[in-house]
Amino acid sequence: MVVAASTCRTETVFDYSWMNVVVAYWNRYPNPSSTHVLTEDTIQREVRDGKLFSRRLLSKTNPVPKWGARFYNNVPVKIVEDSVLDPVKKTFTTFTRNLGMTKIMKVDEIVVYSEQKDGSTLAVRRAYISSQVFGFSRAIRAFGIERFKANGNKASNGFNYVLRRMFPDSLVGGGHHQHAVTTTSPAGELPATTITVSTTNGSLNNQGALKSAAKVGYEFFKSHASKIAQLFSVKN
């Protein structure tokens, strides 16, 4: 069965060093912007090949619109988070996915934190949202995209709150960065540097466009295969 997926990509620059961001990441809950995060537990952690592999289990809750109440009764949802910290390349990659309600809405998210030339830290978030609810898939995916963007803003605000408290005198890059870049695609992420494919109501408009989109998706996942393989290699 082919399941349609919507994607969203956001970029956030934190005016703190990569090391400070990584340290704060493990201490970012609780904060005033994360009341929807109920629990977090580290269930596995190990060092392999000089990299830190971690697996955490979180529970979160979010209110849904009235039309969504028929599918989701607002019970907490378990989230598993795998991460890889590479101190040599100064990258920190997280991969999260929900364990419950996956037929209603499945959200796979990859975030890469990397050091910038001016000493700040760039976080690139990519989410892939799918739904198997017949007749409501498009509406649920659209809701998921908007919720992802809203939660991303909350996460950035909460993260900055923790960074300010932990490292009050450690701003880098002049403290002038803005959180501004967001791109979405109902049919798949289409990097502007590769191919542009026009879409209509979330569907690719012709067979040639479909082939182009498939090529884009293949190239993207091929380029990230090693990271995804590393994340999944954390043993259960």
UniProtKB/Swiss-Prot annotation:
Tissue expression as described in the entry: Widely expressed.
GO molecular function, one term: phosphatidic acid transfer activity
GO CC, alphabetical: mitochondrial crista; mitochondrial intermembrane space; mitochondrion
Chief location bin: mitochondrion
Pfam families, per database record: PRELI
Location relative to the cell: Mitochondrion
Superkingdom, taxonomy of origin: Eukaryota
GO biological process: dendrite morphogenesis; mitochondrion organization; phospholipid transport
Domain PRELI/MSF1: 5-171
Entry annotated with the keyword Mitochondrion: yes
PROSITE patterns hit by this protein: PRELI_MSF1 (PS50904)
Phenotype of gene-disrupted mutants: Lethal at early larval stages.
This protein's UniProt keywords: Mitochondrion
Stored InterPro entries: PRELI/MSF1_dom (IPR006797), Slowmo/Ups (IPR037365)
Function field: Involved in maintaining the structural and functional integrity of mitochondria. Activity is required for maintaining the subcellular distribution, shape and activity of mitochondria in neurons and as a consequence has an important role in the development and maintenance of dendritic arbors. Function may be particularly important in class IV dendritic arborization (da) neurons.
Protein name listed in UniProt: Protein preli-like
Gene that produces this protein: prel
